[in-house]
Amino acid sequence: MEIPEDLRYTREHEWARRKGSAIVVGITDFAQQQLGDVVYVELPDVGDPVKKGESFGVVESTKAVSELFAPISGKVIEVNDPLSDAPETINEDPYEEGWMITIEPSDPKDLEALMDAAAYKAFVEEQE
């Protein structure tokens, strides 16, 4: 299981990466492994507001339907539209090509409140 050091993580298994002043969001390798083959993803539209801890979309796999939760509050400024035609990208490359949305944060400090890689690794080990 891959847990990149440069990302921040949530207890709901989303990751967040700073990209300039924006935050890119996706689901972790652990999450995609638990889901199995992703067959559908529903994401918000550019311009939609998102609130930390609240649902911003849905991922459907052969095993389950899971909500996606925003790691920070802000406004969606970019959506990975190719995922609608190729949702399996989330399984193949969850941290790069499988990113989901980019958020312009209301408060950039929200990112610092998320778990670092070591804390997330410990959290996942408790879940297994």
From Swiss-Prot:
Keywords (A to Z) from UniProt: Lipoyl
Reported cofactor(s): (R)-lipoate
Details of cofactor binding: Binds 1 lipoyl cofactor covalently.
Modified residues (N6-lipoyllysine): 63
Lipoyl-binding domain location: 22-104
GO biological process, one term: glycine decarboxylation via glycine cleavage system
Keyword set includes Signal: no
InterPro entries linked: 2-oxoA_DH_lipoyl-BS, Biotin_lipoyl, GCV_H, GCV_H/Fam206, GCV_H_sub, Single_hybrid_motif
Gene Ontology cellular-component annotations: cytosol; glycine cleavage complex
Record's subunit section: The glycine cleavage system is composed of four proteins: P, T, L and H.
Family the UniProt entry places it in: Belongs to the GcvH family.
Function: The glycine cleavage system catalyzes the degradation of glycine. The H protein shuttles the methylamine group of glycine from the P protein to the T protein.
Record-linked PANTHER family: GLYCINE CLEAVAGE SYSTEM H PROTEIN, GLYCINE CLEAVAGE SYSTEM H PROTEIN-RELATED
Protein name per its UniProtKB record: Glycine cleavage system H protein
Organism: Anaeromyxobacter sp. (strain K)
Taxonomic classification: Bacteria, Pseudomonadati, Myxococcota, Myxococcia, Myxococcales
